[in-house]
Amino acid sequence: ASFLSSKNPVADLVKLNDTDVDYIHVDIMDGKFVPNKTMPYSELKHIYKYTSKRLDVHLMVEDPKKYIPLYAELNTEYITFHVEIDEDIMECLEMIKKYSIKAGLSIKPNTKVSELIPYLPYIDMILVMSVEPGAGGQAFIETSEDKIKEVRSLLNSYNIPAVINVDGGINGDTVKRCKNCDIVTSGSYIVKSDNFQEKISSLR
């Protein structure tokens, strides 16, 4: 579950503790890699004290190395950053692994899947963006279904056990187009509803 569209994240996190959601997806934006910017780490750290769930941290930032040590302190399962950054990707992946956290790479809708190939042996997750990153409530991009299949084929051809996560515009209808993935990340569909568990169950 993602909180980009949440009006009251603390209350929503407490409600999610009573569901069977697998992870809390944490979107971090620096106002440079994407136009929007998230609140400071000091505030986010306070908010995420209220969840008992493991965190799936998505860094939409130009320099992941500044953020990895901070979010490694939390109850974090995955830290994912974008393959499109200009920084040393291997250095960032190694830093995440140093904290015994699973490392992932995220890929924008218009980025070629082949960009991931050099890093496949070192990643635990590929986060396929099914919207342009940086804002909640967007519609699922139709070509994402083919991209998910392409990523699955790539992992199979290289015999890589990484999981595929799909993020953006996920609801009870669009989830049917994500059959080749392992995890879906949904925000507005869950947090804007009256019954979190009902919406989560509809995505399984």
What are the roles of these predicted feature ranges?
Residues T19, Y50, L74, Y99, ...:
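Structural motif
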Residues D30-T38, S42, P109, Y119-V163, ...:
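Glycine/Thr-rich beta-alpha phosphate-binding loop at enzyme active sites
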Residues K37-V57, M95-S106, S144-I164, G168, ...:
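Alpha-helix-loop-beta-strand connector modules within alpha/beta enzyme cores
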Residues A1-S2, I24-V26, L55-L59, E77-F81, ...:
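Hydrophobic faces of well-ordered beta-strands that scaffold small-molecule active sites
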Residues P9-L16, K65-E73, T111-I123, G168-V184:
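Catalytic cores of alpha/beta
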